[in-house]
Swiss-Prot record:
This is Flap endonuclease 1. Its cofactor is Mg(2+). Binds 2 magnesium ions per subunit. They probably participate in the reaction catalyzed by the enzyme. May bind an additional third magnesium ion after substrate binding. The keyword Acetylation does not apply. Structure-specific nuclease with 5'-flap endonuclease and 5'-3' exonuclease activities involved in DNA replication and repair. During DNA replication, cleaves the 5'-overhanging flap structure that is generated by displacement synthesis when DNA polymerase encounters the 5'-end of a downstream Okazaki fragment. It enters the flap from the 5'-end and then tracks to cleave the flap base, leaving a nick for ligation. Also involved in the long patch base excision repair (LP-BER) pathway, by cleaving within the apurinic/apyrimidinic (AP) site-terminated flap. GO terms for molecular function: 5'-3' exonuclease activity; 5'-flap endonuclease activity; DNA binding; magnesium ion binding. It is found in: Nucleus, Nucleolus; Nucleus, Nucleoplasm; Mitochondrion. Residues 362-376 have a biased composition (Basic and acidic residues). GO terms for biological process: base-excision repair; DNA replication, removal of RNA primer; double-strand break repair via nonhomologous end joining; gene conversion at mating-type locus; maintenance of DNA trinucleotide repeats. Residues 134-265 are annotated as: I-domain. The gene is FEN1. It comes from Yarrowia lipolytica (strain CLIB 122 / E 150). Interacts with PCNA. Three molecules of FEN1 bind to one PCNA trimer with each molecule binding to one PCNA monomer. PCNA stimulates the nuclease activity without altering cleavage specificity. Belongs to the XPG/RAD2 endonuclease family. FEN1 subfamily. The keyword Lipid metabolism does not apply.
């Protein structure tokens, strides 16, 4: 879910930190991708014309594999070197959010049964059609990625020669730390809390389908801190105040109020102190609000040491891909072999240095110094050499 209202707040207060881009602009870049988030997207979005998930002749869901195979090929075709990072065990602090998601899923399942009955009882017409569309919409709310689908995705990526990392906890935190350590250029996730973990660059919409025509959003963390005039620690406090997956926020505090409070007080401790000194005010701090525990988790997440992550891109196992995708999962052999050929082609291509690696922006001080030197010499006659006798 990420941080409530953060993207809109950044667009308003530090627009220089965000820019829209095309996938081709990241050629030559290594990117750590939140695999768990991507799989969830694929299971929801990769569907048949009637809205049902893709399945093989045995009735096994293949939406996750179809999405993973073709979206990864698209990135590789554009010169991107992806690293997929998978979730480990969720942190204890996230249990409340997971319970809420389970409750919403159960409510959606009940609604689906009601709507299906409505479709069965109704006559052909606009109302029945709308009810069927509602069934599809609510079914998407019940989607979850199973452990088996996770394992199949890992197997597919390994056969494709794409490196994977299994995080001990949150995938987006591991992605952020790989980027922070310089192992990759950016972290790619839809979760804005990736920024809290310190990723220098966050890419959103990277794994969306080309048909959506959704530009990739590139978010620069240093420019966020500069635009908001905050430290990393203060930014984390702001995000906790906005609301995240690990704790509820203070009721009545929206994005603008959260920013105002942080500007005025500078930390959550001082904000809590301010609110508690004004018991007659509108704002009330939740009982046993675990903001300090959440802050500690965001500042020091449970991740693998980046130096221990062995990230290597290998040749695809063509026959292994055919066995798995064609014989086991019912994919088209021609398409799978064509995809493997695309992977092999990119493995053989020698990486080209990016132009932005050749040029360095000169600091303003240099320009100022030159101007000052020009003023000193202005009006002076050039020195002349004496003629040799």
């Amino acid at each position: 879910m990420g941080i409530k209202g953060l993207n809109k707040l950044l667009m308003e207060h530090c627009p220089a930190a965000l820019r829209s881009s095309e996938i081709k602009n990241f050629g030559g870049r290594k990117v750590a991708i939140d695999a768990s988030m991507s799989l969830y997207q694929f299971v929801i979005a990769v569907r048949q014309a009637d809205g049902q998930q893709l399945t093989n002749e045995n009735g096994e869901t293949t939406s996750h594999l179809m999405g993973m195979f073709y979206r990864t090929l698209r990135m590789v075709d554009n010169g991107i070197k992806p690293v997929y990072v998978f979730d480990g065990k969720p942190p204890v602090l996230k249990s409340g959010e997971l319970a809420k998601r389970k409750e919403r899923r159960e409510e959606a399942l009940k609604k689906i049964e009601e709507l299906k009955q409505q479709v069965e009882d109704g006559e052909e017409g606009e109302e029945t059609k709308e009810a069927q569309e509602d069934v599809t919409r609510f079914e998407k709310r019940t989607v979850r990625v199973t452990p088996e689908q996770n394992d199949e995705a890992k197997k597919l990526l390994t056969l494709m020669g794409i490196p994977i990392v299994e995080a001990p906890c949150e995938a987006e935190a591991q992605c952020a730390k790989l980027a922070e350590a310089g192992k990759v250029y950016a972290a790619a996730s839809e979760d804005m809390d990736t920024l809290c973990f310190g990723s220098p660059v966050l890419l959103r919409h990277l794994t969306f389908s080309e048909a959506k025509k959704m530009p990739i959003s590139e978010i620069n963390f240093a420019k966020i801190l500069e635009g908001l005039e905050m430290t990393h620690a203060q930014f984390i406090d702001l995000c906790i105040l906005l609301g995240c997956d690990y704790a509820d926020t203070i009721r009545g505090v929206g994005p603008q109020t959260a920013l105002k409070l942080m500007k005025e007080h500078g930390s959550l401790e001082k904000i809590v102190e301010h609110i508690e000194k004004n018991p007659s005010g509108k704002l009330k701090v939740p009982e046993n609000w675990p903001y300090q525990e959440v802050r500690a988790l965001l500042q020091a997440p449970d991740v693998l040491d980046s130096s221990s992550c062995d990230i290597k891109w290998n040749n695809p196992d063509v026959e292994g891909l055919v066995d798995f995708l064609v014989r086991d999962k019912g994919f088209s052999e021609d398409r799978v072999r064509a995809g493997a050929a695309r992977l092999m082609k990119q493995v053989k291509v020698k990486p080209q240095a990016r132009l932005d690696g050749f040029f360095k922006v000169m600091p303003k001080e240099g320009g100022e110094k030159r101007k000052a030197d020009d003023k000193k010499t202005k009006g002076k006659k050039p020195a002349t050499k004496k003629a040799k006798k």
